[in-house]
């Protein structure tokens, strides 16, 4: 695994220190909590670099998914962080990324092997699991001892609803940096070619289907599809929420995919392909983003993360709208943060770096301008009205009412079962009802373990 060591300190000499802890993660929790308290006592608010410039230099490491541009992003962030906190040397380790469940498994393997990082990039998909396994430290003492710093960094400006997934059993395990929800991306050229108006916020299933059918046609020997039928956990959850359904019950102890509302939702998505013919058959090689930009897909459910690709391809003829209501209107979201692992030897410095990453104006405005949605209210209201899409403030509005996706500690196994049966359904190897019944049985067994 590739490990990049950065040397961006503004001090003359560095003291070498132990980077990783050994032994049981749970056994070290009390000791690291003690260290936090001691660090807080030594540097009460750390509201600027002067408060820690007299302390010994320390090294911490952050684990981050190896997505495009991750290395350049981290280099820039750490360099800026060290302008205020030169005595904290930050290294990073890039972890190959294919999905959140896969990334979480790799990260836990590192921790179990004694090579875990101090800070980790983690989404809502993983925080419950890390907390349940005793691998994440609560920030509550750090927050209480550093009220001025929280205000200075902008932590208090983070939208409380977006930050809620990182507050578990009355404790805070980091601050949300970014978030996404699924909205409908609309290819304005395709709409204009068929002289169809973009949908309004109050559209429903019938209006959606009417538009999708009108925008499905042949052009220059190529099929243009009105929309896409999603099969992934995150996007399907958004559709389930819009029909008063969900993968799990409220306390995430039982699967509810066999409910009439859930079966109705999955059947509707299936019918988009096989009954109405307005969506292509899902396949591993289906590049929906390029098809959307090429005008072969008119409406595509996606998150704000996709606007970077649209901008890189100079594609501007698009807008967004909330997903159509099925029986209700409910937005589903997922957020990401930088939890501190309980195996860290430097919890105070790790929490300081994590808080800066999540909330600082530099971090939010520099790297979330053309990426995920910023978590800070003021940054959303500053950035979204100035950029494409025109209806971008929809993200700010939905932050108030969006509901987090369900991410139990067994999420990796739950999504594996979910993906398996969605694949079987869309391959016509099992009916929607039978698939959802079997998925429910298997997921219930996982949750009961």
Language model segments and positions:
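Hinge/lid segment of periplasmic solute-binding proteins
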Residues: 39, 43-52, 124-181, 319-321, ...
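Short, solvent-exposed loop/beta-turn-alpha elements that line the ligand-binding surface or hinge
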Residues: 140-158, 200-201, 218-221, 225-226, ...
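Short, low-complexity disordered leader/linker segments with a strong preference
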Residues: 1-61, 83, 382, 386-390, ...
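Extracytoplasmic "Venus flytrap"/periplasmic binding protein-like
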Residues: 80, 84-157, 193-195, 291, ...
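Extracytoplasmic/periplasmic substrate-recognition and gating elements
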Residues: 83, 89, 113, 194, ...
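Glycine-centered hinge/linker elements that transmit conformational signals in sensory
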Residues: 209-214, 251-282, 323
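Conserved C-terminal helix/tail region of periplasmic/extracytoplasmic solute-binding proteins
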Residues: 42-46, 192, 198, 271-274, ...
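Long, aromatic- and glycine/proline-rich binding clefts that accommodate carbohydrate-like moieties
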Residues: 156-157, 368-420, 424
């Amino acid at each position: 695994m590739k490990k990049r060591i950065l040397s961006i300190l503004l001090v003359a000499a560095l003291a070498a220190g132990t980077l990783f802890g050994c032994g049981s993660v749970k056994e070290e929790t009390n000791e690291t909590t003690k260290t936090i308290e001691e660090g807080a006592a030594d540097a009460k608010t750390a509201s600027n670099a002067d408060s820690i410039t007299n302390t010994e230099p320390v090294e911490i490491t952050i684990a981050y998914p190896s997505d495009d541009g991750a290395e350049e992003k981290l280099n820039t962030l750490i360099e800026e962080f060290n302008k205020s906190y030169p005595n904290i040397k930050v290294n990073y380790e890039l972890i190959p990324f294919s999905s959140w469940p896969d990334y979480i498994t790799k990260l836990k393997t590192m921790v179990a092997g004694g090579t875990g990082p101090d800070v980790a990039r983690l989404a809502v998909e993983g925080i419950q699991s890390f907390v349940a396994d005793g691998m994440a430290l609560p920030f509550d003492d750090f927050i209480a001892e550093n009220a001025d710093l929280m205000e200075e960094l902008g932590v208090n400006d983070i939208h409380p609803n977006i930050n809620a997934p990182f507050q578990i059993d009355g404790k805070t395990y980091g601050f949300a940096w970014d978030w996404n929800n699924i909205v409908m991306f609309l290819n304005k050229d395709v709409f204009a070619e068929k002289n169809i108006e973009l949908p309004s916020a109050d559209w429903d299933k019938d209006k959606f289907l009417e538009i999708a059918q009108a925008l499905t046609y042949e052009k220059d020997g190529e099929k243009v599809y009105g929309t896409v039928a999603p099969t992934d956990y995150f996007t399907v959850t958004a559709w389930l929420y819009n029909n008063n359904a969900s993968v799990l019950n409220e306390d995430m102890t039982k699967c509810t995919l066999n409910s009439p509302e859930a079966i109705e939702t999955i059947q509707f998505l299936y019918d988009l392909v096989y009954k109405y013919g307005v969506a292509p058959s899902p396949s591993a090689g289906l590049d929906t983003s390029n098809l959307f930009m090429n005008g072969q897909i008119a409406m595509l459910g996606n998150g704000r993360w996709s606007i970077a690709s649209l901008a890189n391809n100079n594609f501007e003829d698009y807008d967004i709208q909330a997903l159509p209501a099925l029986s209700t209107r409910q937005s589903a979201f997922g957020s990401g943060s930088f939890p501190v692992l309980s195996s860290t030897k430097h919890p105070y410095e790790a929490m300081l770096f994590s808080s800066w990453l999540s909330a600082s104006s530099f971090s939010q405005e520099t790297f979330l301008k053309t990426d995920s949605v910023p978590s800070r209210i003021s940054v959303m209201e500053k950035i979204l009205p100035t950029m494409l899409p025109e209806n971008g403030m929809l993200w700010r509005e939905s932050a108030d009412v969006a509901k987090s996706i369900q991410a139990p500690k067994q999420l990796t196994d739950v999504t594996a079962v979910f993906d398996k049966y969605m694949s079987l359904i869309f391959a016509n190897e099992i009916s929607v009802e039978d698939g959802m019944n079997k998925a429910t049985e298997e997921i219930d067994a996982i949750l009961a373990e």
